[in-house]
């Protein structure tokens, strides 16, 4: 038992238990733990003191007496993963966003925990190689327990909207919508996507067309790109134009290529992002889309 308790310590997990169980755990580690395990146990001073806010957003596992210990070890040890269609180009962007939201006033303790997980490589980006590969990547290397893939509890999928407005959903993503929500793309609603009440695997689709639409003009200019092609656009037009281009359409921002997306976060602040974000009512609280996306990351830690 001491090795599992200390694994929880080293991986930043928490244990919620009654006083007698906590006493037994402390005694067991003291009497049976190795020197290294005892040091890790002492270092994680908040192991039994999870805050209400952290408990609200972290996923809780009810460990009953018959819960297989090797399955528990897997859940604690397996890195949380975000399946991204362009992780090889975009993961650095999301790591930067995690960094700048550490000082978020609403969720400072929660996003501090998220940053720590990212820094310790307990959270990783998993490259899907395109929208069509997302489902296969999500299902890759399953860990089956009683016919259920519990690796999905540690998985969040992210993909672009790819539509010209916020009124429609992309029919080319119909298989994804059915996989994640059980609904056809003609039936999907905002509350199916922009919520924390999702069954695993958790998922998020950008409210705007793609991640490129979230960066203000000044970030493109700072990175050396020509934004004259998008000047004069309304805010809504800018949110849904194909700014970065694709195989058949040139980028509206001259000189920009997908490989350049990492350069757009240089000097980017949380305040810059927040100015143009859609707000959602989550559990009676108004939060931005980026806060919601980060909270989904927290759910899989």
Segment roles from a protein language model:
Residues 1-46:
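Interfaces and regulatory segments of ATP-dependent nucleotide/adenylate/phosphodiester-chemistry enzymes
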Residues 4-5, 9, 17, 69, ...:
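Extended hydrophobic/Leu-rich segments
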Residues 29-163:
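RecA-like P-loop NTPase motor core
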Residues 97-105, 141-146, 176-193, 297:
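Hydrophobic, Leu/Ile/Phe/Ala-enriched alpha-helical segments that form helix-helix packing faces
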Residues 137, 214, 218, 276-279, ...:
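Residues that form generic nucleotide/phosphate-binding pockets
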Residues 160, 164-269:
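Activity-critical C-terminal alpha-helical subdomain
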Residues 262-301:
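Hydrophobic, glycine-enriched assembly/anchoring segments
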């Amino acid at each position: 038992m001491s090795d599992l308790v200390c694994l929880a310590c080293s991986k930043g997990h928490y244990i919620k238990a009654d006083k007698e169980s906590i006493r037994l755990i402390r005694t067991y580690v003291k009497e049976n733990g190795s020197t290294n395990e005892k040091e890790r146990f002492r270092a994680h001073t908040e192991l039994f003191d999870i805050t209400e806010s952290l408990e609200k957003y972290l996923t809780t596992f009810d460990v009953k007496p018959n819960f297989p210990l090797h399955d528990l070890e897997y859940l604690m040890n397996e890195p949380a993963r975000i399946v991204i269609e362009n992780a090889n180009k975009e993961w650095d962007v999301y790591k930067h966003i995690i960094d700048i939201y550490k000082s978020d006033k609403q969720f400072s303790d929660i996003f501090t925990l998220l940053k720590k997980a990212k820094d310790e490589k307990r959270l990783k980006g998993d490259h899907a190689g395109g929208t069509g590969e997302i489902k296969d990547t999500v299902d890759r290397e399953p860990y089956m327990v009683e016919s259920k893939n519990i690796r999905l509890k540690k998985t969040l999928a992210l993909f672009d909207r790819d539509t010209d407005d916020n009124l429609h959903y992309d029919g080319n993503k119909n298989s994804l919508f059915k996989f994640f929500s059980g609904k056809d793309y003609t039936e999907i609603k905002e509350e199916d996507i922009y919520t924390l009440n999702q069954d695993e695997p958790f998922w998020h689709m950008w409210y705007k067309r793609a991640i490129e639409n979230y960066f203000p003009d000044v970030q493109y200019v700072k990175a050396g790109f020509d934004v004259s092609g998008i000047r004069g656009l309304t805010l809504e037009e800018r949110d849904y134009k194909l700014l970065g281009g694709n195989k058949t359409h040139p980028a509206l921002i001259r000189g920009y290529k997908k490989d350049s997306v990492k350069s757009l976060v240089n000097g980017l602040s949380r305040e810059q992002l927040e100015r143009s974000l859609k707000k959602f009512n989550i559990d009676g609280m108004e939060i931005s889309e980026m806060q919601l996306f980060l909270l989904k990351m927290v759910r899989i830690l």
